[in-house]
Amino acid sequence: MAQVPMINILEAALRHGYAVGAFNVHTHEAAAVIRIHEQLRAPAIIQLIQPSAGFMGGRADFMNATPEEMCCGISRFCRLVQPMMEQASVPVALNLDHGNDPETAKICVDNGFSAVMIDG
């Protein structure tokens, strides 16, 4: 099953009265999130927090990553998790959690995120 918009997962949960977990991952943890949700036959939300994008972009001081490092990190993260999501047997959404700025949110959307949250 391919990636789905997060709103689809949330609307179904609201309609049918269940909760959906959203898990902040950095790399291969995404595979574990998907695998357990497949066992439960439940939709999953995978999230990337903005500082992790800086770290994935090669910045040791990830809280001060440049826009270029953020873009690189988001792109790397997507190349890692999107194949996992495409092979999943359950709906999976990809969300930016605790975003700090519209520029990073746009980079995420351009790289295939189905939702972003700017609250940082």
Set out the residue ranges of the language-model regions.
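Hydrophobic faces of well-ordered beta-strands that scaffold small-molecule active sites
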Residues: V20-V25, A44-L48, V92-H98, V116-I118
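N-terminal amphipathic alpha-helix/helix-capping segment at the start of soluble metabolic enzymes
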Residues: M1-G21, A32, C78, Q82
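Glycine-enriched alpha-helix->loop->beta-strand junction motifs that scaffold or abut catalytic
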Residues: L40-R41, D110-A115
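Glycine-rich tight-turn/loop motif centered on a GG-T
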Residues: Y18-A19, G54-I74, F113-G120
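N-terminal low-complexity or amphipathic/hydrophobic leaders
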Residues: V25-A60
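Catalytic cores of alpha/beta
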Residues: A30-V33, N100-G112
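Alpha-helix-loop-beta-strand connector modules within alpha/beta enzyme cores
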Residues: N64-V90
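Active-site-adjacent beta->alpha loops and helix N-cap segments on the catalytic face
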Residues: Q3, I74, N100-T104, G120
